[in-house]
Amino acid sequence: MKITLLVVGRTVDNNIIAGIKDYTQRVGHFVQFDMEVIPELKNAKKLSEAQQKEMEGELILKAIAPGDRVVLLDEGGKEFRSTEFAAWIEHKQNISTKRLLFIVGGPYGFSQKVYETAHEKLSLSKMTFSHQMIRLLFIEQLYRAYTIINHLPYHHE
C-alpha cells in the first residue's frame, strides 16, 4: 500500500518543514509515503470563498487516481484514538488498498464535488489547527500508528 498526503499550498514555516521531513523519513521505514502539493491559486485574494473552494476542488479531483481510497482530513470527520487509527490503517493494508489518499483542503475547506468523491472523512481533533500544522500532526500520527502496529516503543497509553 502507498499512502499520500495531498495538500493545497506549500509549507512555509521552517520548523514545520523540519518536522515533516523527520516524520516522513520515519514513516518511510514502514510504508511508501509521500506528500503531494497542489500549488496555491494565483490571485486567490480576489476570489470569493466559494470560488476558491471550487477551483481548489478541481485541482484536488485531478490528483485523484482510479483505485484511490480518498480520505478527507475534515473537522466533521470521524475521530480516532491513536490505537484505533493504527487498527484502521492496518485494516486498509489487509484489504489491499492500492493507495490511501489523505487530503488537506485549502483555508475554506473542500468543494461539494470533493466531498462527494471522498470515501471517508477523518478528524484529527475537535480543535482547529492551521493547514500548515495539520500536515505535521497527521504525519506524526501516521508514524505513531505504524509503531503501534509493529509493537515498537513510541506510543504510551
PLM region descriptions:
Residues M1-V27:
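N-terminal beta1-alpha1 ligand-phosphate binding loop
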Residues Q32-F33, P39-K98:
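S-adenosyl-L-methionine/SAH cofactor-binding core of RNA-modifying enzymes
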Residues G105-G106, T117:
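Proline/glycine-rich low-complexity loops and linkers
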Residues Q112-H156:
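Structured adenosyl-cofactor binding patch, chiefly the S-adenosyl-L-methionine
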